[in-house]
Every structure is written in structure tokens, then in C-alpha cells.
Amino acid sequence: MGETVVHGTTVLAIKKDGKVVMAGDGQVTMGDTVVKHQAKKVRKMYHDRILTGFSGSTADAFTLFERLEGKLEQYNGNLKRAAVELAKDWRMDRALRRLEALLVAADRNDCFILSGTGDVIEPDDGLAAVGSGAPYALAAARALIRHTGMSIREIAEEAMNIAASICIYTNREFTFEEL
């Protein structure tokens, strides 16, 4: 199977006018081998008020999901505060610093990328993407949101299809979550 590095994915979040859609593909790759086609990389949390998605190591991502969920409970669903506090923990905790995952978290007000270095990045335009197909999905979503009248769900679908047509680590077994 070659190397055992778990590769790529594509997760895309679009937040506009109080609505949010998050999409993720289903492919899991180890080295040069596809080992799963229908993984669910996006989900709802905190009473179905927050959307989250991940790229990178699945086990590491679930560790971060659990930590984020705990912070959301601690801060009563305040995504911005929970994300910042998780990032602080991520930077200070030796075990967390070794985690190899990126998270996207969004609600109707905020959208963040939480990086492996403990950064919290808030995109200027409400669009966020992580994973190997992220540049393609993000570029497509930006173009479509600026130059069409499509809904954000339609934009997410088309952007993910474009990413899947370019990125070999992204398939068309998409999962969508919406708020």
C-alpha cells in the first residue's frame, strides 16, 4: 500500500445571510489506496446549532470534535469563544499539538478554520474550505457566489463537484449539512 499517511478530503462551508451549508466528500485514502468511499466528515453538534467538518487524521479529528463540543457546552454554544479556547488548549497541550487535523466550524453568525498550529482563522467572506480539494472548492464557490443567483446549497454542490473533478483525493459521495 505504500506509505500509510491518510490523505486528503474536501470540506467546504458557505455562510451567507444567516444560512450555512457545509459539504464534505466521502473518500478516505491511505497512501495511494482508497480505503473508504462514504466517510461522513461533516456533522452537526451542540443541539444541531453548529456545523463542523474535518480533514486530516480521523482519530485526531474526533479528538478535536470532542474537545470543541466540550468548549461549546462550557460557553453555552458561543462558537467564537469555544474556538478561541480550543485553540489555546491546542497550543498549550503537548498531546494536542501533535494532532494532524483541520476543523471547519460554522453557525449562522460565524465561520472558522481551526488549524493544526492552534490558529483560529475567520474568513472574510463566509467561505471556508480544508483538505486537498479545498483550493478548488473554494475558488469555485467564490466565483459562483459572486456571479450567479444560485442558492448556497447549489453552490456547495457545484463547487464540490468541481473539486472532485480535479482532486484525486476527493470523490463525489458528498454529505451536506445545513442550518
UniProtKB/Swiss-Prot annotation:
Its main location: cytoplasm. It holds the Pfam family Proteasome. Signal peptide: none annotated. It is an enzyme of class 3 (hydrolase). GO terms for biological process: proteolysis involved in protein catabolic process. Belongs to the peptidase T1B family. HslV subfamily. This is ATP-dependent protease subunit HslV.
